[in-house]
A protein has these predicted regions:
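Phosphate/pyrophosphate-binding loops at sites that engage ATP/ADP/AMP, CoA/4′-phosphopantetheine
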Residues: 111-129
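Short coil/turn connectors at secondary-structure junctions
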Residues: 2-4, 28-34, 56-58, 65-69, ...
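Active-site pocket-shaping loop/turn-to-helix segments
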Residues: 6-16, 50-52, 93-112, 173-177
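Conserved catalytic cysteine-centered active-site region
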Residues: 1-33, 39, 150-181
């Protein structure tokens, strides 16, 4: 009853935007907790290329000053562009996607963000135990990861690849839940 509620609709970034808003709220109200939900139904037309990736599900996360599972860092890099690779118009129950173009954009965005992150913070692959991905389908993230793996040592490549495979287990079962797929990983 005495709660704030906001709904964001953005397939790739909605849950992450919710987490960013929650971090700001926690900074101002350190004793509070914020519930962030990422949920969706990905539905594509019968016989379309996207049909095999569809799914439905949700993730729920409680954001607080004292996290128990995952601590969020303040360092970040991001990229926004108006890319017509995927969309679900208000008038349609099914989404539309240009799969090849979408893959190209996903990989390009990942590489661009990685290059920016390295430039800002001097990061290398050795600095990461694992990298989580937004996964419209599970091979998509690996295609992006492969673009940067050669920058690391053999140990880095093995560690990040192994953790990537582990992170896809639930996504393979559930299918694409859009914004929640990153946190399902």
């Amino acid at each position: 009853e005495h709660a704030r509620c906001i709904e964001l609709k953005q397939a790739c970034y909605g849950a992450t935007a919710g987490i960013q808003l929650a971090k700001g709220h926690i900074a101002l109200n350190p004793e509070s907790r914020v519930l962030v939900l990422g949920s969706d139904i990905s539905r594509y037309g019968i016989g379309t290329a996207g049909e095999v990736t569809q799914g439905a599900g949700a993730v729920a996360m409680i954001i607080s000053k004292e996290p128990r599972i995952l601590a969020l860092e303040n360092e970040s890099s991001y990229l926004t562009a108006d890319v017509m690779d995927f969309w679900r118009p208000i008038y349609s129950e099914t989404a539309f996607v240009d799969g090849k173009y979408s893959n190209e954009q996903y990989i390009s965005f990942f590489v661009n963000v990685w290059e920016d992150f390295k430039a800002k913070y001097g990061a290398t692959l050795a600095d990461f135990g694992a990298i989580c991905f937004h996964l419209p389908y599970t091979k998509m993230g690996m295609k992006a990861l492969r673009e940067v793996l050669d920058e690391g040592s053999e140990a880095d490549r093995e560690r990040l690849s192994a953790h990537y495979r582990t992170s896809t287990v639930y996504n393979k079962i559930v299918g694409n839940i859009y914004t929640g797929s990153l946190y399902l990983s």
